[in-house]
């Protein structure tokens, strides 16, 4: 079974992982995050440097999600909101807790150690740039330290004017009081920008240790791995073997916006251009594909009914889209039919599988297409009824005012 795990607490980093019937949080998912045996030293997993490297808890998203035009499920942007999360049992098999394709959301704890270290470094840096007029140790800023290193170099290269200029600049109170305060304010602003980038995870390095980053090159190099393993080094594990043992697939689930853009371009190309698509009446659906599911549908379907419920019956009798084993078998059959059309072309088949994992199916068979059509009709009926109720309420209020 394939599931998705949200890394970096980022909606754009929902990665697919393969799990077996016996896999649990303890014996599978938690192994993804340690430094030496997992992926923490190979790629950034945590939201920012201010978080611990390993999550403290794991949740599943029970937001119903979106039903795509191909009959697949996409994650909603509110999938990781607190009200849409349910904690997973660490020792219970994942297959008994999750639907195929469901989203697992790790909970990350702030690292007090990292926060304190960063704060001390930034405060020390700010201290060195205090205006000379108020600093207990004027003239110790990093710029002055660099200038002091360049003075003997300038003298050695017989550049007395430059050396003299540098010697003047390193003197305390060389700049005017206004300039000193202006530079200090700019320095505070610079520290604020750096902190913002790190907090938001825009800058989120694996490590600040250059040696550690350099040593990772050996692990990510297939030739280096082969050489070290053949030499009997048990501390170095082949990267592909490690990824395979963790269930890593390497595919990311698309956000709804990515899906919408990709599906729109697909429809336009298929129709032979925007004009042809407009004439065929396909533009409206391509511009806003899919249907947002409601409570009790999608990933909120009762998991205990997985092997007894019928998705295609419930859409007609209960007027809602529920998940079932029948539905996932139909998805698998659809994908197999699509792959058969490539006549054994491995490249095209792999590309289609990657697209399926990222965007779902684009050309469903009649059974899946009918399912989506019925669910869209239900959504349209609800929207029409809601609009009628709103119109009736407005007219009722107008009648009261006239009386």
UniProtKB/Swiss-Prot annotation:
Taken from the UniProt entry, a GO cellular component term is: cytoplasm
**Which of the residues are on side Lumenal?**
1-177
Q: From the record, what ranges are coiled-coil?
A: 330-388
Q: Does the keyword Membrane apply?
A: yes
Entry-listed glycosylation sites:
89, 173
Q: Which GO terms describe its biological process?
A: protein folding; protein localization to cell surface
Extra information: Present with 21400 molecules/cell in log phase SD medium.
Functionally, this protein is described as follows:
May be involved in the secretion of hexose transporters from the endoplasmic reticulum. Involved in secretion of GAL2 and HXT1.
Identify this protein by name: Glucose-signaling factor 2
| Species in which this protein is naturally found | Saccharomyces cerevisiae (strain ATCC 204508 / S288c) (Baker's yeast)
What is this organism's lineage?
Eukaryota, Fungi, Dikarya, Ascomycota, Saccharomycotina
